[in-house]
């Protein structure tokens, strides 16, 4: 596999994983407020 493909896969994985994390952070902040 090329480094470019690995880089793109890692970026996609981070974006997909960041979605639920952002929602969880927003929910936690709303709960604290």
From Swiss-Prot:
TM ranges: 5-25
Record's subcellular location: Plastid, Chloroplast thylakoid membrane
Lipid bilayer topology: Single-pass membrane protein
Presence of keyword Plastid: yes
GO cellular component: chloroplast thylakoid membrane; photosystem II
Keywords: Chloroplast, Membrane, Photosynthesis, Photosystem II, Plastid, Thylakoid, Transmembrane, Transmembrane helix
BP terms from Gene Ontology: photosynthesis
Pfam families found in the cross-reference section: PSII_Ycf12
Family matches, as InterPro entries: PSII_Ycf12_core-subunit
Record bears the keyword Chloroplast: yes
SS bond list: none
Annotated function: A core subunit of photosystem II (PSII), probably helps stabilize the reaction center.
NCBIfam families: PRK13686.1
Family, as annotated: Belongs to the Psb30/Ycf12 family.
Subunit structure, as described in the record: PSII is composed of 1 copy each of membrane proteins PsbA, PsbB, PsbC, PsbD, PsbE, PsbF, PsbH, PsbI, PsbJ, PsbK, PsbL, PsbM, PsbT, PsbX, PsbY, PsbZ, Psb30/Ycf12, peripheral proteins of the oxygen-evolving complex and a large number of cofactors. It forms dimeric complexes.
HAMAP family: PSII_Psb30_Ycf12
Protein name stated in the entry: Photosystem II reaction center protein Psb30
Taxonomic source organism: Anthoceros angustus (Hornwort)
Gene: psb30
């Amino acid at each position: 596999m090329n480094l470019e493909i690995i880089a793109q896969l890692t970026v996609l994985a981070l974006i997909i994983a960041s979605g639920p994390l952002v929602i969880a952070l927003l929910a936690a902040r709303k709960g604290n407020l």
